[in-house]
Each structure stands twice: as structure tokens, then as C-alpha cells.
Amino acid sequence: KVALLTDAQMTIPILIVLSVWKGLGYKIIILLAALQGVDERYVKAGRMDGAGSFRRICYIILPILRPTILFLSVTSLIGAFKIFDEVYIMYGQKPGPLQSGLTIVYYIFDKFYRHWEFTTASAAAFLLFLVILFFTLLQFLFSSERRKS
């Protein structure tokens, strides 16, 4: 056994580091593809207008990348709520020491497959859907307000 995995206070930081590491490659590839799609003429025009590197990034490149950043933030948010594999692989039958790694998806799995409490699992899954929907709509709302200004 790994000593870090038996410490209840280290469960959440370990899960965060593992989840970030797991999804970082995908997000970097998506951002690099979006950066390659930025037309060089915009950057050259900003350079000709006297904009420095920081201003070109803030006022030219980031607004062009805004849809990609919104996509990545929405998928990251959904992925953050759906953490199950990491907990199940690292801790097996229990969600960590003192149930310190209990996530909503692990709770749904436990209620549905181990305790056969189908109604509780369905209610928890529906609540998870509502929470994800709320935060996704909130992100779209903030994104559309930033576009207007």
C-alpha cells in the first residue's frame, strides 16, 4: 500500500492532481489546435498598430479563443463532477479512508449496484444532472455577457 492513499486528508488533493494530470494533455492539444487557427493577419495588424505582446494576447488572441476556452471550461466542469474512475481504481471497494473520496458518481454507483437502492440512485443522478445544468448555463450566461461588453 502507498502511504499517501491511507491518509484521509490527502485523498482530495491526490484526486485533484490525478484528474488535472489525466485531462491536461487533451486540453493542451485542443488549445494548441485553436491557437493554430488564429489568423496571423490579426496579430500582424496588432503589431503594426503598436500593441505589445501582452496587449496582442489579451485583445486579439484571447477573444478569438473564447469559444474554445468556453468549451474546455464546460467539459472540465462536467468532468469534475463526474469523478469515479480515479476513486474506484485507487481505493477499490471503499471510497477512500473514512469515505474521504466519496463523490456523487461513486455514491450513485454504490447505491445502485451494491445496495440496490434504485430510487435513491436515480434521485442522486437527477440532482447531479441539475447541478451540472445549472453551472453550465451559468458559464454560458457569463460568456455571453462578456461578449456583449
Show the residue positions of the predicted features:
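The feature captures the transmembrane alpha-helix scaffold of multi-pass secondary transporters
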Residues: 9-16, 26, 30, 57, ...
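Membrane-interfacial helix termini and adjacent extracytoplasmic/periplasmic loops
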Residues: 1-20, 85-101
